[in-house]
């Protein structure tokens, strides 16, 4: 698939140790498939509403940059917990988002996160259909809770489970040092 047009990607919800790996994957795939520019939303959909975005194509130029991004802790682009209102309750918010996406010539919209992020993608996709937009909206699942419907597991869950298991092992070992 050739990606004609520009891409935008955002992160939301709690950070995991792998959220930036997902971001690196979206960026690399978009560039490999011909996307002109890959924009990153600063602080998720809330940042987009505030017109806070960066041209990631200017920041990530080499394979080493991508590898470093994969290993960067926390959320590289920043996060938010902002929930989009229902379309019927606040059409103006959606109009503003789509105006910004049109200005940036966005054809592909990726959002990395858990349940609320997937809800955001669904609402934007539904509004896009309603308005006749040709923007493709895709959710990239990431959650330490492993509670997304119709998924066996998500990136982030294994890291959290390993952390808890390692911590418990250390607590048990510490407890064994005393009589």
Enumerate the language-model features and the residues they cover:
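Glycine-rich oxoanion-binding loops at beta->alpha junctions
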Residues: 51-107, 116, 144, 155-169
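N-terminal phosphate-binding or glycine-rich loops at protein starts, especially the Walker A/P-loop
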Residues: 3-53
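Short glycine-/acidic-enriched loop or helix-start segments at secondary-structure transitions
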Residues: 19-20, 50, 120-122, 149
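Internal, active-site/partner-interface "lid" segment
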Residues: 172-179
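Short, acidic/small-residue loops that bind anionic groups at enzyme active sites
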Residues: 38, 125-154, 161-163
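Short Gly/Thr/Asp-enriched flexible loops that form oxyanion-binding sites at enzyme active sites
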Residues: 21-26, 115-132
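Short glycine-rich or small-residue beta-strand-to-loop segments that form or flank ligand, phosphate
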Residues: 6-16, 75-80, 107-113, 139
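Short, ordered loop/turn segments at secondary-structure junctions
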Residues: 12-14, 41-47, 81-82, 114-117, ...
């Amino acid at each position: 698939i050739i990606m004609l047009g520009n891409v935008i990607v955002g992160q939301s919800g709690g950070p995991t140790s792998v959220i930036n790996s997902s971001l690196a994957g979206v960026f690399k795939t978009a560039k490999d498939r011909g996307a002109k520019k890959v924009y990153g939303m600063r602080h998720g959909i809330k940042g987009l509403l505030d017109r806070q975005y960066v041209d990631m194509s200017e920041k990530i130029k080499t394979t080493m940059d991508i590898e470093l991004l994969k290993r960067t802790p926390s959320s590289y682009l920043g996060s938010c917990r902002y929930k989009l209102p229902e379309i019927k309750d606040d059409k103006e918010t959606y109009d503003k988002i789509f105006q910004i996406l049109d200005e940036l010539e966005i054809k592909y919209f990726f959002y990395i996160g858990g349940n609320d992020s997937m809800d955001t993608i669904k609402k934007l996709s539904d509004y896009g259909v309603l308005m006749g937009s040709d923007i493709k909206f895709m959710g990239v699942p990431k959650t330490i809770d492993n509670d997304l419907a119709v998924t066996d597991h998500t990136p982030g869950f294994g890291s959290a489970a390993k952390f808890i298991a390692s911590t418990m092992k250390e607590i048990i070992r510490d407890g064994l040092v005393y009589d």
